[in-house]
Amino acid sequence: RKNKKGRKLIMGKRTKQTITLGSGNLYITEFSGSIPENTEIEKDTNLAGYIQGGAELEHKPEYYTAEDDLGKAKKTIITKEEAKLKSGIMTWNGETLKKLVATGRVTEDTKKGIRTVKIGGIDNNDNKSYIIHFVHKDPVDGDVRVTVVGKNTAGFTLAFAKDKETVIDAEFEAAPSDDEGTLILLQEEIEQTA
């Protein structure tokens, strides 16, 4: 196959011609020191809820440049990295909020049919880190997975309006997930060889 300019198109999964289009699913589960296989994370019990507005991954490095007065010698090094994964969670409940707030506690009284979420009180900080795992499914061009370990650092706003759904905009700041200092784990589904 060729494009309009007569160039040969490379067919297959996740090539340089692949257009990534669409949203995906967001999974959140407690981090216990290592990131498990995708099948362990991608369970219904770990689904944060359905999302609105997709997901956004941001990587922001900081650099330091040393330069002589005459501009003849120059060296630039990376001094710091920051990574964030942002998403809007549209379907949620108290269990979702507990994963978004370090001071959140959830109790359920099944006899009364009430789930209670308590938020606040610095002494209630659970100091937990979570695996935040976004999956963009594409059966033709291949799936893309983005995984970070971190905490929601944006807090949340619950806006209850008569003509708009309530969406929690979460912003997870990534922390190193291994001994190499990995902040972002991005996996692409590619063609398999025999």
Model segments located where?
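Polar/acidic, low-complexity leader/linker segments enriched in S/T/G and N/D
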Residues: 6-49, 194
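Short acidic, glycine-rich loop/turn motifs
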Residues: 30, 134-141, 174-176
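A glycine-rich, hydrophobic loop/mini-helix early in the fold
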Residues: 45-81
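A generic structural signal for short beta-strands and their flanking turns/coil linkers
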Residues: 53, 81-85, 115, 128-130
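Oligomerization/assembly interface segments of phage tail-like spikes and tubes
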Residues: 74-97, 163-177
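Extended, positively charged loop/linker patches that create polyanion-binding surfaces
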Residues: 99-138
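Mixed-charge, glycine-accented linear interaction segment located at domain edges/termini
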Residues: 142-194
